[in-house]
Amino acid sequence: MKVFIVIMIIVVIFFALILLDIFMGRAGYRKKAYEPVFSKKKSDIELIHCGADLVERMMNDIRQAASSVHMMFFIMKNDEVSHNMYTLLKTKAQAGVSVYLLLDWAGCRAIKKTALQTMKNAGVHVHVMNRPRFPFFFFHMQKRNHRKITVIDGKIGYIGGFNIAEEYLGKKAKFGNWEDYHLRMIGEGVHDLQTLFASDLKRNTGIELGSDVWPKLQQGTISHKIYATDGYSLENIYLANIAQAKNRLTVCTPYYIPSKPLQEALINARKNGVSVRIIVPMKSDHPLVREAAFTYYSELLDAGCLIYRYYQGFYHVKALIIDDHLSIIGTANFDKRSLFLNEEVNVEIDDEAFTSEVYATIEEDMKKSELLTMEDFSKRTFRQRPAEWLGRALSYFL
């Protein structure tokens, strides 16, 4: 018995030290967090919600690149889809195009070192970000650059939720169809995507891009602004967005693990007469995230919020839609990791026609979703409850 008590004390102390490391690391990191909110711009913006279409469009644009290809992804892997992209990047680098590829340490661990080295040998500037380091080792282990940005010749930009791997094209039976939203942008906003890429490159490598990668760009037709977050400002931005809602709002997220203020903001919006819809996946791609989400649903259902669970594949969309004019689409999930740890980027689009297109896409998603009722919620087995509360307890790190 004494041995067991000693072991438990050691375990408690160990986890307490980990938490102390993470929270002290986060407090210290705040001074160098990069969270720009760019001024309003006008661009031509296209919504893409099919992974195969996205990769085809992106690769076609890269094939036409004349001067530069700047790509930043959270996840790329050791599969055919990823290797097709690696081959194209190598081809462009060998043709004299300046090619940079930024990858997150946690997200790119499936890539073989030989693949990275082969790209480097071909002239691709490959850099891995957010490697764990001291001090605050455990904090840095939790940091993720979750941004997905591609800028081609400084004129064409891509940003959104898709990564580059087979499952994002619906080629993994485990997930089936993969629903996500990505944006293709031409116009002034590409300048801001390039600035964000250049900043992440400099902060992680010390390398500065030349001024020639910011060509003069023409205005497009859709008003928008781009903002990046680094674990500190996203919660307040979302709270301000939700407070604007007068008639309806829709949250699309693969992981519904909000902060307490955001949960309360949605409930208050519903109490004030705003229609609140939340779309989440039926299945899960990570342990405990679905279980953690269930601990928030009772309050939402009691308030009259509608929760739809997408069942025709996996739902990875990151979007917040306010009334009939505001669409926020990007890389940030509606969870604590995106709110308080990750480096993210969103595009806030103020345009009725574009928002109408987004709503039409969401309506199609809802046809492939099941409405969660309080009766269904109450039928959860008691065996599920411990996993739910374990997920809730660990929600900051899921």
Swiss-Prot record:
Disruption phenotype: Cells lacking this gene show a lack of cardiolipin.
Molecular function terms from GO: cardiolipin synthase activity
TM helices/strands, residue ranges: 3-23
Transmembrane helix keyword on record: yes
Keywords of the record: Cell membrane, Membrane, Repeat, Transferase, Transmembrane, Transmembrane helix
Pfam families noted in UniProt: PLDc_2 (PF13091)
Gene3D superfamilies: Endonuclease Chain A (3.30.870.10)
Residue ranges constituting the PLD phosphodiesterase domain according to the UniProt record: 141-168, 311-338
GO biological process, any: cardiolipin biosynthetic process
Subcellular location: Cell membrane
Signal sequence, start to end: none
Main location: membrane
Membrane topology: Single-pass membrane protein
UniProt GO cellular component terms: plasma membrane
Role description: Involved in the biosynthesis of cardiolipin.
Protein name: Minor cardiolipin synthase ClsB
Name of the encoding gene: clsB
